[in-house]
Amino acid sequence: MAKEELIEMHGLVDEVLPDSRFRVTLDNGHKLVAYTSGKMRKNHIRILAGDQVSLELSPYDLSKGRITFRHIAGRGPGPAPRQSR
């Protein structure tokens, strides 16, 4: 499956499920089960209930998704600001 076939959506994490899965409600009200992407797992990015996330959905199965980004209020995508010592 090519990347251009994926559907990008935004949603809210309702519940943390076992095995690194999450129950997510999309902005349009659709509910699905999602898992974290490999880069998020590799960088130990924690996702909790109530977090705003971006997901990728396959057009073939809209009941499953992959979480690609966790949105933090007041901060956009990009590197974290460096703290001076």
Swiss-Prot record:
Family note: Belongs to the IF-1 family.
Coiled coil regions, renumbered to chain: none
Primary site of residence: cytoplasm
InterPro entries: NA-bd_OB-fold, RNA-binding_domain_S1_IF1, TIF_IF1
Entries under Pfam families matching the protein: eIF-1a
Record CDD domains: S1_IF1 (cd04451)
Role, per record: One of the essential components for the initiation of protein synthesis. Stabilizes the binding of IF-2 and IF-3 on the 30S subunit to which N-formylmethionyl-tRNA(fMet) subsequently binds. Helps modulate mRNA selection, yielding the 30S pre-initiation complex (PIC). Upon addition of the 50S ribosomal subunit IF-1, IF-2 and IF-3 are released leaving the mature 70S translation initiation complex.
Subunit architecture: Component of the 30S ribosomal translation pre-initiation complex which assembles on the 30S ribosome in the order IF-2 and IF-3, IF-1 and N-formylmethionyl-tRNA(fMet); mRNA recruitment can occur at any time during PIC assembly.
Record keywords, A-Z: Cytoplasm, Initiation factor, Protein biosynthesis, RNA-binding, rRNA-binding
S1-like domain span: 1-72
Subcellular location: Cytoplasm
GO cellular component terms, A-Z: cytosol
Any GO molecular function: rRNA binding
Superkingdom: Bacteria
Signal peptide as annotated in the record: none
Protein name: Translation initiation factor IF-1
Record-linked PROSITE patterns: S1_IF1_TYPE
